[in-house]
């Protein structure tokens, strides 16, 4: 779990060294949602965390893309679960990942990319790592084991999360990234809304459905059974 930046001002920046010193070295920011930081704010917290010996973790999706496509799909197909992934395409993640990496390079700061879901985003990470930039990337079991075909199921709402499930090609790329070390963390992004909550809040539009799935209790068993036992990962990896 991370503390989250929802705005940046002098008072927030001044408290970063204290927070890190108290044992909370990683803090999180978003490039989408109402509490997102703009590029200037991201640069400020990247630099402040660098100086304090901390690390910024970033949820990477382009807010303008999600808003533009979401508004369109809310009018055209509000109850189709596929409207969710269509409102957050792969380029939405890749643009934000690329931008965060450029900002981190400018600030001369390390950065942590959370819940990577696309081959396009992974390509950006690999390019930065190859150039010597200190970048840590994570993905999650849901992006390794499920794809967007799940949204066609009867209760496709239960798979709504952000970023959304992707293609089979993206899944394969993420396994490769985890195996070769480009992705060094498999986390959960645990967010356990019930199916009943999703049905209720998403009944008028799937774009109002709360996003997230549980995963804390299944992460290790899934990585072992689907990764190690299927030859995708070595046990030491």
Where in the sequence are the language-model features?
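A beta-strand-loop signature enriched in Asp, Gly, Thr, and Trp
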Residues: 199-210, 229-237
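Histidine/acidic residue-rich metal-binding segments in metalloenzymes
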Residues: 11-186, 202
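Active-site beta->alpha loop and helix N-cap motifs at the rims of alpha/beta catalytic domains
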Residues: 5-10
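Gly/Ser/Thr-rich active-site loops/lids in small-molecule metabolic enzymes
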Residues: 93, 205-221
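Short acidic-hydrophobic catalytic motif
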Residues: 189
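C-terminal helical cap
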Residues: 162-172, 176-180, 218-237
């Amino acid at each position: 779990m991370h503390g989250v930046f929802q705005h940046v001002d002098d008072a927030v920046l001044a408290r970063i060294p204290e927070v890190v010193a108290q044992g909370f070295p990683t803090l999180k920011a978003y490039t989408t949602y109402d509490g997102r930081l703009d590029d200037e704010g991201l640069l400020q917290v990247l630099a402040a965390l660098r100086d304090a010996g901390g690390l910024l973790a970033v949820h990477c999706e382009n807010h303008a893309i999600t808003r533009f496509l979401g508004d369109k799909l809310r009018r055209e197909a509000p109850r189709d679960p596929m409207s969710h992934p269509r409102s957050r395409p792969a380029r939405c993640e890749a643009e934000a990942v690329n931008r965060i990496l450029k900002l981190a390079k400018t600030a001369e700061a390390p950065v942590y990319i959370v819940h990577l879901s696309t081959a396009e985003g992974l390509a950006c990470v690999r390019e930065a790592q190859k150039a010597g930039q200190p970048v840590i990337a994570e993905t999650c079991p849901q992006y390794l084991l499920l794809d967007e075909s799940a949204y066609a199921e009867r209760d496709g709402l239960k798979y709504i999360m952000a970023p959304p499930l992707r293609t089979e090609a993206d899944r394969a790329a993420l396994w490769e990234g985890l195996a070769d070390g480009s992705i060094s963390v498999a986390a959960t992004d645990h967010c356990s809304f019930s199916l009943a909550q999703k049905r209720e809040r998403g009944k008028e539009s799937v774009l109002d459905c709360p996003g997230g799935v549980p995963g804390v209790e299944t992460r290790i068993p899934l990585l072992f059974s689907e990764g190690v036992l299927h030859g995708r990962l070595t046990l030491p990896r």
